Amino acid sequence: MRLTIIAPDSVHEHEVSPSLLIQDIINIVEATADLPPAVIVLTSDAGTPLTDPTRTLESYGLNGETATIFLTPTGPPVASSSSIPFPDADADIERMRLQALGNPSLMNDLRERDPETFAAIQGGTQSFKKALQLAQSRQRDAEFEKQRQIEALNADPYDIEAQKKIEEAIRMEAVLENMQHAMEYSPESFGNVTMLYINVEVNGHPVKAFVDSGAQTTIISPECAEQCGIMRLLDTRFAGMAEGVGTARILGRIHSAQIKLGSLYLPCAFSVLEGRSVDLLFGLDMLKRHQCCIDLSTNTLRINNTEVPFLSEHELPDKARRRGEAQVAGEMGDAAGQGVKAGVASPKIGKKTFPGEGHALGAGSSTGPGTATGSASATGARTGGTASVPSPSNRWKEDDIQTLVNLGAPRAQAIQLLEASGGNVDVAASMLFG
């Protein structure tokens, strides 16, 4: 039988037999509650005093699977456990404070989330003790206020607003229980995850690349492209706007540059984006092209039989250490994920055109009529007269334009795609679908 002994300031549970004598129960209480037998008065949950030490629990009707008795000390009032001075209490508090001081990760979290406790820990034992007492007082006040609100809400069971508040309170209690369960059984879920970076070389220049399988394209910043000496290969026909949660300007595309991963030298294409928070983002296009495997069990990026280790936290670039991972990922991933589709000759960025009327060489106007006649005749001899550049829609076959329109591209974008691909419909279609 499970016997619960409820004292004024504590609760004790014991597995006992119903045939146990009351005297034995008194001895148990004496040992657990540290009270002399003369001041111990036991009462059953039915209010029956257990005064005869020679009788058993069963004789008082306490013979079920569980039973409860109440302990009521007599004589001089007994101080509660919270008011009894324990000589080891300060030592325990100091031990707790020193443990916190010896945990740099905990101290960093306290500095950001609870500066008051952080200052109390650094202020010494008494300061930390006052902070603990204040926290306990706040907890008691919060429990009291919670109970008061529950009583106020239960005062009118037909009040719809009160019932909604009760429902929300129940929901929040479930949320807190779920959080406490997670903190107890999976505390690692509350830690920060180190983003995946690797050491690479672009055109012989060392770069720390961010590996992101959620980004559609591989991205490089203009500054990094300049440092690597590949900005001269930028194809501005692929300029546009990348739109996700935010927007970023696509300067163009570098179709092929040499990148070194481990001992492998591989070709890699880059989209050049302004305002990115990383120098190089290794996206899904290159991961799939080179059949890379992100192996988190070995913390490596595996390409065939070559393994490139991911960088540890202290090796990350300064940008990644200074900024939160969620902020970095949010700024990079969305624009990268839609970079190609939104960035191929996007009409949002005006395309640079030749600053003239499109006349052939030698057909420009002049001040003298003789010069104009001579120029026109000379031009006519070479080109058959004034030759205007055909409009973009006349340069390409109508069937090719219609093919791209049928695939979902507006007519203007279809013409731009054909210009970017040199009239190759298959290449233009691949650009359309990223």
Curated annotation (Swiss-Prot):
Sorted alphabetically, which SMART domains does this protein's record hold?
UBA (SM00165)
Instruction: Indicate the residues that form the catalytic site.
Output: 212
The keyword Aminoacyl-tRNA synthetase is annotated on this UniProt entry? no
UniProt cross-references to PROSITE patterns, sorted A to Z: UBA
User: EC class of this enzyme?
Assistant: hydrolase
Where does the Ubiquitin-like domain lie? 1-77
InterPro entries in the record: Peptidase_aspartic_DDI1-type, Peptidase_aspartic_dom_sf, UBA, UBA-like_sf, Ubiquitin-like_domsf
Compartments, record wording = Cytoplasm
Q: Where is the composition biased (Low complexity)?
A: 368-388
Positions of region (Disordered): 315-396
Check the record and name the CDD domains matching this protein: RP_DDI, UBA_cnDdi1_like
Q: Where is the composition biased (Basic and acidic residues)?
A: 315-325
Q: Which GO terms describe its cellular component?
A: cytoplasm
The UBA domain is annotated at 395-434
Pfam families linked to this entry: Asp_protease, UBA
Enzyme Commission number, as recorded: 3.4.23.-
Is Hydrolase one of the keywords UniProt gives this record? yes
GO biological process terms, alphabetically, are: protein transport; proteolysis
Classify the source by domain of life: Eukaryota
UniProt lists the family membership as follows:
Belongs to the DDI1 family.
* Subunit text: Binds ubiquitin and polyubiquitinated proteins.
Briefly state the protein's biological role. Answer: Probable aspartic protease. May be involved in the regulation of exocytosis. Acts as a linker between the 19S proteasome and polyubiquitinated proteins via UBA domain interactions with ubiquitin for their subsequent degradation. Required for S-phase checkpoint control.
User: What name has this protein been given in UniProt?
Assistant: DNA damage-inducible protein 1
Organism equals: Cryptococcus neoformans var. neoformans serotype D (strain JEC21 / ATCC MYA-565)
Q: What is the lineage of its organism?
A: Eukaryota, Fungi, Dikarya, Basidiomycota, Agaricomycotina
